[in-house]
Amino acid sequence: MSDYLVIVESPAKAKTIERYLGKKYKVKASMGHVRDLPKSQMGVDIEQNFEPKYITIRGKGPVLKELKTAAKKAKKVYLAADPDREGEAIAWHLAHSLDLDLNSDCRVVFNEITKDAIKESFKHPRMINMDLVDAQQARRILDRLVGYKISPILWKKVKKGLSAGRVQSVALRLIIDREKEINDFKPEEYWTIDGTFLKGQETFEASFFGKNGKKLPLNSEADVKEILSQLKGNQYTVEKVTKKERKRNPALPFTTSTLQQEAARKLNFRAKKTMMIAQQLYEGIDLGREGTVGLITYMRTDSTRISNTAVDEAAAFIDQTYGKEFLGGKRKPAKKNENAQDAHEAIRPTSVLRKPSELKAVLGRDQMRLYKLIWERFVASQMAPAVLDTMSVDLTNNGLTFRANGSKVKFSGFMKVYVEGKDDQMEEKDRMLPDLQEGDTVLSKDIEPEQHFTQPPPRYTEARLVKTLEERGIGRPSTYAPTLDTIQRRGYVALDNKRFVPTELGQIVLDLIMEFFPEIINVEFTAKMERDLDHVEEGNTEWVKIIDNFYTDFEKRVKKAESEMKEVEIEPEYAGEDCELCSSPMVYKMGRYGKFLACSNFPDCRNTKPIVKQIGVKCPSCGEGNIVERKSKKKRVFYGCDRYPDCEFVSWDKPIERKCPKCGKMLVEKKLKKGIQVQCVECDYKEEPQK
């Protein structure tokens, strides 16, 4: 019989930890929360200081029974749920369900699942932190009050299945506000003049800067013609050469937010997928002889702190692998305040000695890609800054200035290991300039004016929305991925080219919430609520006070909405074609991944089909069908014949109407970093890339 029972959330975690602790310990899984508010009722007694009425979650009865039996046999029970508010709440619910002494040292926390970390954590058990529990409970009750009061009104006035929440409503507002900015945007004309210049046999690029040393904007073609008329000949004098050495510091190691952003940029992962794979890496991977080991630290964190042990291991690794000159400078020590929040670390590999290249045999493709990203980011964060030599050159002709900028990596530093996703294209090539001295003469080879128009702000990607939510203080590490998932499942937004587009339904719901519950979608109000919850976690505020302050005004608004909110009828958008199964009109519907066609006779007829987008090109294979744009299971655009499966023509590149002038075969548009280039699929014919 085992002397000690340890309870964690998942079987994978249990298996790993049990091996580290030895025969005296039995580790079992609670499979997440065992108690929660009931789904069939609000479950909050408003008259009794918002007292929650918890019940055992459906299906968890057998799990609890097994845990109770094991707990009675054990000398001591340890609760080792995750090291955050949610984990503390799970431990508290388990303690209640198993009749454990809440004043006993039954709580064990760790940031990584490795032998040393687990052994060390069991040397320092503590009481359940009720401040953390209260913060989680306050969030849960707030979300229940908002959801349980507003959602039924939306069901009655708009349609079934809708929901409203504090964080999801603000996220929806950000997306819709951005769409309004885009629609209201008025493009403004501007021009640039770019030149190609010669110094001996070397060419370089420079752009028009201004006149008589002052920057001069070009707002029209008339402005450009005026400048071109003032240029005299093709000789330019090098008037000013500025050389500087610039340092570029590495990014900090990952938090939950920055991991989700970078995984979206570099790996094309959705936030939900990133967290799922990170959970696998945290809970443990079977490494063969070494057994099951957690490869990364806990993945729900907003801290960039690194333990001294991890810093020292990274320093030794960098010194040995890359050399002393690649070591980072003076490192900040770990925080001394070891409360629950400060005790969190950044997301990092549990050991830098487990290099990604050595784990290929034991990791799946996506696991490997995410681990490599985390490993490289952490190692780079402990390395020396990169050093760049920059050079700025002013060329003059009749008082007009053209400016050339160049840079060269003098010392790669951390860039030897990792460069942030948004900067990859910028840093791929050095922008070199010839050896130019003040007073030199250079010749212009080509002067090209080009018209431009200012662009509206871009729609939000998942990465950008997560970053904005974090910057505005909305939500916490555990809420970003579920929030993005919810607004898509409800049909409030759809993804178009990996960017969020609000739907008509999303606009209707937001308009109603803005009219009747303005504080719910107020960014500053929601951010203040998050800060208040943090104050509860820190033990500085009572959770009941926060909810009471919120509910007094909220209840009045609920009553007003119930009596004054008008029913909204969403008119169907007809597609102009009939259902091939029942002859009813087909209508456009918005799903999680965008628009699709559905029969208006639903639910009697459940016919649906994707919207086919023709590109106006005949199929080059069969000559009968038309080429249409389609999407793969991974949402990648490709092109195929609309006679499929009779014709199986497919192409990743977009076919065009013109034929190759050399061989008469199909031409396609290929996307390159320089722009879109027309190429022949058979011969070597290529055209100049177009931006």
Swiss-Prot record:
Residues 129-558 form the Topo IA-type catalytic domain. A zinc finger (C4-type) spans 579-605, 619-647, 660-683. GO terms for molecular function: DNA binding; DNA topoisomerase type I (single strand cut, ATP-independent) activity; zinc ion binding. Coiled coil: none annotated. Gene3D superfamilies: 3.40.50.140, Bacterial Topoisomerase I, domain 1, Topoisomerase I, domain 2, Topoisomerase I, domain 3, Topoisomerase I, domain 4. One of its GO terms (biological process) is DNA topological change. Keywords: DNA-binding, Isomerase, Magnesium, Metal-binding, Repeat, Topoisomerase, Zinc, Zinc-finger. The record marks H33, R139, R140, D143, Y148, W155, R300, R490 as: Interaction with DNA. Disulfide bonds: none annotated. CDD domains: TOP1Ac (cd00186), TOPRIM_TopoIA_TopoI (cd03363). Its cofactor is Mg(2+). Residues 3-114 form the Toprim domain. Residues 163-168 are annotated as: Interaction with DNA. It is an enzyme of class 5 (isomerase). One of its GO terms (cellular component) is chromosome. The active site is at Y298 (o-(5'-phospho-dna)-tyrosine intermediate). Its EC number is 5.6.2.1. Mg(2+) binds at E9, D82. Releases the supercoiling and torsional tension of DNA, which is introduced during the DNA replication and transcription, by transiently cleaving and rejoining one strand of the DNA duplex. Introduces a single-strand break via transesterification at a target site in duplex DNA. The scissile phosphodiester is attacked by the catalytic tyrosine of the enzyme, resulting in the formation of a DNA-(5'-phosphotyrosyl)-enzyme intermediate and the expulsion of a 3'-OH DNA strand. The free DNA strand then undergoes passage around the unbroken strand, thus removing DNA supercoils. Monomer. Interacts with the RNA polymerase core. HAMAP family: Topoisom_1_prok. Belongs to the type IA topoisomerase family. This is DNA topoisomerase 1. It comes from Bacillus subtilis (strain 168). The lineage of its organism: Bacteria, Bacillati, Bacillota, Bacilli, Bacillales.
